[in-house]
């Protein structure tokens, strides 16, 4: 069941309202994310403390994502997003009050990171599953491309804004900015976003959480293209960890990098992502989603390989920008593939598993490649992972199940389950 309006102006308005609310949330969250990271880094100068902060920021979301996917299918997704925003803002307010009272213990920062991770874990499947309720299927790629451009633009501005604010005011004042932006986002959703709950949310929920979770994994297992895609997606996320996290260290070692060099590589990467999102919004990708995923994945692999061999800093920055351009071209069709082909009543659970993969595989990659980078040159890591990404992306074209799924434009239903309503549709 599609819940978006048939009126062109109506769906555009509702989508604009939703994306605007998400931009407010993302901006405030990004300010706090950078502020907490830099505060811990400058106060402790400890790699262990930074690692604990990173773990507290991703582990709760990883653990919660599958259950959050169940909630996104059982309940009103708009309300889930609103409640998680309110919860994050409340936790941020508590920390701000502690700081104002003179308590500056590091464990408070870790607790806040964990609470924010819980909120993110709850709302991410709901956000990804709500968008197809607002946007006509044929417009999903372009809208996701626009969304990536907006997010990239904010991620370009956020570290600069956070650094400027941290130099002019206290951490607790910056936390209040996040609370205000969260309040604005919630107000926009409550007052201006009008979207009906999806079909399953309107039904009486007779099954338990774990039964629904089991049905979600059963759905993934029954539809081979989802299983194949998640295996590919997870391996790619693991392999691109070096190009995502080790570039500052590589620039410092190879090009005797300064703060200026590190700023340049951050800027060119996010400018590339901004451009890539715009390209996807205009182009829309190939007719087959998997072909676009394979092409962009191959370009990411070539760019990563080039980071290991390019002799000059500006050449390095150029290939990093190329990777940035390719990220939205990879992520957008990946997201749309799920949004187009998965049954609406299972979309939250499928996105929950996808969120679990995205929140786990890159940190796992860093846990492996980080120590390795202290033993061998990062250039070799980039070369090897780049080659593997190219080969894996090329191999996707040979997967008939995935290629066939890339052509589909209608959701596939789950095989009839006696415990689950709304799944009488014939399986494709």
List the predicted regions and their residue ranges:
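Juxtamembrane intracellular "pre-TM" segments in multi-pass secondary transporters
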Residues: 2-15, 195-231, 415-420
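Helix-loop boundary and gating motifs at the non-cytosolic
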Residues: 4-60, 218-269
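C-terminal transmembrane bundle of multi-pass solute transporters/carriers
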Residues: 63, 74, 80, 94, ...
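Helix-breaking motifs and short loop linkers at transmembrane-helix boundaries and internal kinks
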Residues: 44, 76, 98-100, 310-311
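Substrate-agnostic recognition of the 12-TM MFS/MFS-like secondary transporter fold
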Residues: 16-33, 56-70, 76-91, 108-166, ...
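Hydrophobic alpha-helical transmembrane segments
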Residues: 16, 51-52, 82, 107-111, ...
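Transmembrane alpha-helix termini and helix-breaking/packing motifs in multi-pass membrane transporters
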Residues: 37-43, 96-101, 157-177, 253-254, ...
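Helix-loop junctions on the cytosolic side of multi-pass membrane transporters
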Residues: 129, 133, 175-206, 397-411
């Amino acid at each position: 069941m599609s819940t978006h309006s048939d009126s062109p102006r109506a769906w555009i308005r509702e989508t604009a309202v939703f994306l605007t609310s998400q931009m407010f949330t993302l901006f405030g969250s990004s300010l706090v994310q950078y502020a907490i990271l830099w505060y811990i880094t400058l106060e402790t100068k400890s790699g262990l403390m930074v690692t604990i902060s990173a773990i507290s920021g991703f582990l709760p979301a990883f653990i919660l994502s599958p259950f959050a996917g169940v909630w996104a299918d059982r309940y009103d997704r708009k309300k889930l997003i609103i409640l998680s925003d309110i919860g994050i803002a409340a936790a941020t307010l508590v920390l701000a009050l502690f700081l104002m009272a003179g308590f500056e213990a590091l464990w408070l920062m870790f607790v806040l990171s964990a609470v924010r991770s819980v909120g993110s874990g709850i709302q991410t499947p709901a956000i990804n599953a709500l968008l197809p309720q607002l946007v006509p299927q044929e417009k999903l790629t372009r809208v996701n491309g626009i969304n990536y451009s907006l997010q990239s633009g904010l991620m370009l501005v956020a570290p600069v804004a956070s650094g400027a604010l941290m130099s002019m005011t206290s951490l607790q004042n910056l936390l209040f900015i996040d609370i205000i932006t969260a309040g604005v986002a919630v107000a926009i959703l409550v007052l201006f976003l009008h979207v009906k709950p999806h079909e399953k949310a309107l039904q009486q929920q007779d099954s338990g959480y774990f039964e629904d979770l089991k049905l979600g994994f059963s759905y993934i297992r029954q539809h081979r293209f989802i299983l194949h895609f998640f295996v590919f997606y997870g391996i790619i996320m693991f392999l691109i960890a070096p190009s995502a996290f080790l570039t500052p260290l590589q620039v410092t070692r190879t090009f005797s990098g300064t703060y200026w060099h590190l700023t340049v590589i951050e800027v060119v990467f996010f400018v590339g992502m901004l451009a890539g999102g715009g390209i996807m919004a205009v182009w829309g990708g190939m007719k087959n989603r998997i072909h676009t995923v394979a092409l962009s994945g191959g370009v990411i692999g070539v760019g990563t390989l080039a980071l290991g061999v390019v002799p000059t800093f500006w050449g390095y920055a150029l290939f990093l920008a190329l990777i940035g351009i390719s990220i939205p071209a990879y992520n957008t069709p990946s997201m749309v593939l799920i949004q187009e082909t998965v049954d609406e009543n299972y979309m939250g659970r499928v996105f929950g598993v996808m969120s679990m993969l995205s929140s786990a595989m890159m940190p796992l990659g860093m846990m492996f490649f980080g120590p390795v980078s202290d033993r061998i040159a990062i250039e070799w890591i980039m070369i090897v992972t780049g080659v593997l990404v190219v080969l894996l992306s090329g191999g996707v074209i040979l997967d008939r199940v995935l290629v066939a799924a890339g052509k589909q434009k209608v959701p596939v239903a789950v095989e009839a389950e006696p415990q689950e309503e709304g799944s009488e549709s014939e399986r494709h």
